[in-house]
From Swiss-Prot:
Known partners and oligomeric status: Homodimer.
Entry-linked PANTHER family: HISTIDINOL-PHOSPHATE AMINOTRANSFERASE, HISTIDINOL-PHOSPHATE AMINOTRANSFERASE-RELATED
Name of the protein in question: Histidinol-phosphate aminotransferase
InterPro entries the UniProt entry points to: Aminotrans_II_pyridoxalP_BS (IPR001917), Aminotransferase_I/II_large (IPR004839), HisP_aminotrans (IPR005861), PyrdxlP-dep_Trfase (IPR015424), PyrdxlP-dep_Trfase_major (IPR015421), PyrdxlP-dep_Trfase_small (IPR015422)
One Pfam family linked to the record: Aminotran_1_2
GO biological process terms, semicolon-separated: L-histidine biosynthetic process
The protein's required cofactors: pyridoxal 5'-phosphate
Amino acid sequence: MTVGERITLADLPLRDDLRGKSPYGAPQLQVPVRLNTNENPHPPSQALVDDVTRSVGEAAAELHRYPDRDAVALRSDLADYLNLRTGVELSVENLWAANGSNEVLQQLLQAFGGPGRSAIGFVPSYSMHPIIADATRTEWLQALRADDFGLDVDTAVREIAARRPDLVFVTSPNNPSGQSVPLEDLRRLLDAMETGILILDEAYGEFSSQPSGVALIDQYPTKLVVSRTMSKAFAFAGGRLGYLVAAPAVIEAMLLVRLPYHLSSLTQAAARAALRHADDTLASVATLIAERDRVANSLSQLGFRVVPSDANFILFGEFADAPATWRRYLDQGVLIRDVGIPGYLRTTIGLAEENDALLTASARLVETELAATLGAS
């Protein structure tokens, strides 16, 4: 028996604007091939595991003390990493870190959104953006992407000018479609904003062929914040570490809304260890890009429509019934993601043998009624 199980959510004094909402979450199922959450499939090296073990062990000796509430050493390491990756000279004052990029985004909306303010996104895109807007009582606006799921910059500029949102979400590479946004397009969006902040979500930035938007922060210090994560290319999803890059004044704003001691000493120690092994870990990015291209070409040859991707996942279709097709993949031991786009599914790029399993299942499905829009019999 579970204590209190006689009541339901309807019995609680829940905020009216949260009633009828659904929680975020990808299915967590034990299947042979899991390609639904865009993790790096390559496990950490033994050297990294040993470093994390040692570093966390040292931090554990001080567990009776609160952690560094501002995570200064970690933020300094993140600045050093980005200096090398982007060529932009950053300091600890330009970095903020939290428990995953979703907490970063939540803190941004706590500081710059809220009642009476609005945020706009260009959909389909990352589904947590409107959820975080709802949670912070920020009015959520949205505009459609182009038919190929790319960002229609002309439309975006018009929407920004007409609706004057306080926050603009741009995801590059976009999740779930995978396209990156060139710097010249970002400039157009930023120039269209009289006020407000553009949040550039670069969760998959290490995979992108485009330069990071970090290069534009000095030109647009009041308008641009870049959000990033160690959960994807960095193979640190279990560590839960996200961060943002911005002008120092934005970091001051984060101090106003963060919870005390929000990053544990163990998280800080493990993340710093992961950063020390960045070169080894990120060597897998080239392998994943090559696998992405192989899978995309193979799916195209089977007759699927594949959306060109600049990330570690692929959006593909078209299916007569995407939810039923998702289930058919699952029946074959392959878990991918139904992202709610009619006719399309998204697959993470995994290890070569996992990708082969996806392609084998796809070859079977292309001959079924679920792929009727492809002309299959």
